[in-house]
Amino acid sequence: MSGLFGILSPAKRVNGDGLPLFYNIHKSVELQRCHRDTARVSVTLAELLMSVEDEGDDQSRAMDIAVASNFWSSVPSSRVPSSSPFVLSFKDLTYSVKIKKKFKPFPCCGNSPFDGNDMEMNTKVLLNGISGEAREGEMMAVLGASGSGKSTLIDALANRISKESLRGDITLNGEVLESSLHKVISAYVMQDDLLFPMLTVEETLMFSAEFRLPSSLSKKKKKARVQALIDQLGLRNAAKTVIGDEGHRGVSGGERRRVSIGTDIIHDPIILFLDEPTSGLDSTSAYMVVKVLQRIAQSGSIVIMSIHQPSYRILGLLDKLIFLSRGNTVYSGSPTHLPQFFSEFGHPIPENENKPEFALDLIRELEDSPEGTKSLVEFHKQWRAKQTSSQSRRNTNVSLKDAISASISRGKLVSGATNLRSSFQTFANPFWTEMLVIGKRSILNSRRQPELFGIRLGAVLVTGMILATIFWKLDNSPRGIQERLGFFAFAMSTTFYTCAEAIPVFLQERYIFMRETAYNAYRRSSYVLAHTIISIPALIILSAAFAASTFSAVGLAGGSEGFLFFFFTILTAFWAGSSFVTFLSGVVSHVMIGFTVVVAILAYFLLFSGFFISRDRIPLYWIWFHYLSLVKYPYEGVLQNEFEDPTKCFVRGIQMFDNSPLGQVPTAVKISLLKSMSGVLGINVTAETCVTTGIDILKQQGITEISKWNCLWITVAWGFFFRVLFYFTLLIGSKNKRR
């Protein structure tokens, strides 16, 4: 690890409170800041790792302690600027979208009957020549009313807008950022707090560390990073508390927001983007969140965020402001220059007025005026030109490659890059490690919500018991045949319908998945395979419960071998249904839409399965849907399992009349009719003559093409097919980029 971080790791030192010594130094520097009003020293990852004990002999450990002592004694009380600073510059960013506008051929006549059909395209400019600069150690805030372009600018800087649509230049230390490198050295915190509800704060951050920190880093050091981050985020008292949701009490809104930030900065990124991190929070919680962001910036990061309306205290933490109005810059610069700017514009800020609030109110008034904010935009251009000419620009002569290399040597980037194009890893961990972590997290979250699986298991058991009592011990009569067909059709369709619960499960994880994969926390393939594997035990339990509660009670044939095939058919039906519903959950975006689509499609599958109408009677123009029906194959499989014995008789001579108007006549009359039929047909048909065997029933149902084992394997193949489709759906549909 010394090659990666450039420093040695001394033995762990703790104080009387059991906290690492670096935390005390961290606190002492904070106290110095209070007395001397200097910037605070923040602990980078390399400094953190210095406090973690490595295995080695006593001599090596003593040497490490000496190195650590020299290191900490050299840290000044005020923050020392990095010798290789990062500067993110953006120039003339322009982004527009095409929107549909209704075309009215006769606007003077009001609404036209053609309004809904004839459309013309209109261009809306969301960003119009936005320029600026953010430096390491600084916090930049983007302000403006709703629709001003705040989130769009953050998305543009965070590489969340396709390069084909965005015009302008975005550089880091003068060099254009490649998309792959951008994902490694930056992080993006969404406006919504997307977290697993039943994981604790500590577990959430630990799983994030296992995803984002490389496998070469020991478990002990990952835990140390998590503990330091918990202290940095001010979450020590909530570390063992679950995140919570509507049905489970958990952390507060401010704590939840800080956890969201922590999951994205676990790898100590150079650039941190945040979309309105204070929205929905009270003033105290909002201030604490921004205070945490200030510490992150002072540890050597560039922090850029959109914010709706900062308070006076929050304004004092910010280094740069950009005010936007309908995609145009109306102010950019330091918060301290804000009064001077508006004073020179002719609208001085009153002494006791909240400066950002005054600015936003003035911008809204100008937007409602006939001329809009054009005068303010032009004044800002002149003012910026004058400010730029009167100030000496601070340029960095350090190349991006050298700056990143120096950053890695300080431990700032654990999964970073020493080469701008090829030497860095796209993902921090190998495929199998990602699978294990994803599976472990999903199992832990599900285990703390046993009621979800319990309800599903209960539904299967109740359905099985109802079917068992309705179809109790079916006999081998014509009526028993029809009842068997009904039982199998309902049983197979039930297995598919009970899989609909997979829709809300993935939809709840969708945005967590999109956030994590947007910056290469793990591969989409490892996510799909992990969730496929962990779903199998639940399907086995459900299948065993259903088969055990129905097979013997209904009186199905085949003995132990028949039971095993029935069980495996139920299992493959659950598997195919679960895969199909999982695929649909990746396509639809709303729970109710998903349920509607699933119910409709499964109804069509049942309709064309061969139960309501046999294959031979389905019209040719619909026969293709019969072969696409997921219910067809398990349904035909269990029918063959039940009726494949050619020696077993289901209808004897006297039973021929059971399902006809002659079914109620006396037995003697039936025997007389059989004798008459025998004379006409030339075949001796007695009361005990077998008229219909199981093979005859299969022929009547049109089930002669595929063997029962092939039906089983086709059902399994359908499950794999939909899992592959699910993967490609995630691959295509989770790009997280605007067009």
Swiss-Prot record:
Q: Indicate which residues the UniProt annotation says bind ATP.
A: 144-151
Residues forming the ABC transporter domain are: 88-351
Q: Where in the cell is it found?
A: Membrane
Query: A GO CC term?
Result: membrane
The ABC transmembrane type-2 domain is annotated at 433-643
Q: Which InterPro entries match?
A: AAA+_ATPase, ABC2_TM, ABC_transporter-like_ATP-bd, ABC_transporter-like_CS, ABCG_transporters, P-loop_NTPase
Membrane protein topology class: Multi-pass membrane protein
Question: A GO term (biological process) for this protein?
Answer: organic acid transmembrane transport
MF terms from GO for this chain are: ABC-type transporter activity; ATP binding; ATP hydrolysis activity
Keywords, comma-separated and alphabetical: ATP-binding, Membrane, Nucleotide-binding, Transmembrane, Transmembrane helix, Transport
Q: Which family does it belong to?
A: Belongs to the ABC transporter superfamily. ABCG family. Eye pigment precursor importer (TC 3.A.1.204) subfamily.
Q: What's the protein name?
A: ABC transporter G family member 20
Q: Which organism is it from?
A: Arabidopsis thaliana (Mouse-ear cress)
The record's gene field reads ABCG20
